[in-house]
């Protein structure tokens, strides 16, 4: 069910979903507000009203990020083979640096992550990472492989990240902007005969 709410100078679209959950929650997915309610919960207007300041702040943040994203360029000409070669090179270098071995690398469409790394040392890469600049691909791989040292995003984790990427906060912001850019520009694009067909709706 699609709705709208007017907050200050912004008209914000949102969707209401009912699920088998205990408590209501709100989340933004690539610029769109989702209101997820328990099956028997009806008063969604009350929740929106109570959290309108938070909704406005998040919506403004996303709008600003999307504006910044318009100046960025996607690597549309990079082939699957070129992407894999680059990625394997980064994995090899980072493995040597961290003294960590990766067992397997998988590629698949992921709706909410750039990648993941399991306790079994399996690295899963979101196929849309192909369209990012080299330095961001390297950062994502390093970020995921650090989870073999520290599973949580705690102070220890970010200290390790900062030792190699002292500007990691700016990089994280840039990655968020690329999420939005891909959502806006890449969803309609399909290239026949490769594993990047039917790009997912990117979420963050």
Give names to the regions the model predicted.
Residues 144:
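Walker B catalytic acidic pair
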């Amino acid at each position: 069910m699609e709705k709208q709410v007017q907050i200050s100078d912004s008209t914000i679209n949102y969707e209401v979903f009912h699920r088998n959950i205990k408590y209501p929650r709100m989340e933004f997915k690539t610029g769109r507000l989702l209101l997820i309610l328990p099956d028997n919960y009806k008063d969604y207007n009350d929740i929106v009203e109570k959290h309108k300041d938070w909704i406005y702040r998040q919506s403004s943040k996303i709008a600003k990020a999307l504006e910044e994203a318009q100046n960025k360029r996607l690597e549309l000409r990079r082939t699957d083979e070129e992407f894999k070669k680059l990625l394997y090179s980064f994995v090899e270098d980072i493995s040597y640096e961290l003294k960590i071995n990766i067992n397997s690398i998988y590629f698949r469409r992921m709706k909410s992550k750039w990648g993941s790394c399991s306790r079994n040392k399996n690295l899963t890469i979101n196929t849309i990472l192909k369209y990012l600049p080299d330095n961001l691909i390297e950062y994502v791989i390093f970020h995921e492989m650090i989870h073999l040292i520290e599973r949580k995003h705690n102070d220890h984790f970010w200290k390790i990240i900062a030792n190699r990427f002292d500007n990691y906060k700016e990089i994280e912001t840039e990655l968020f902007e690329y999420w939005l850019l891909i959502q806006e520009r890449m969803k309609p694009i399909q290239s026949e005969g490769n594993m990047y067909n039917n790009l997912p709706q990117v979420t963050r």
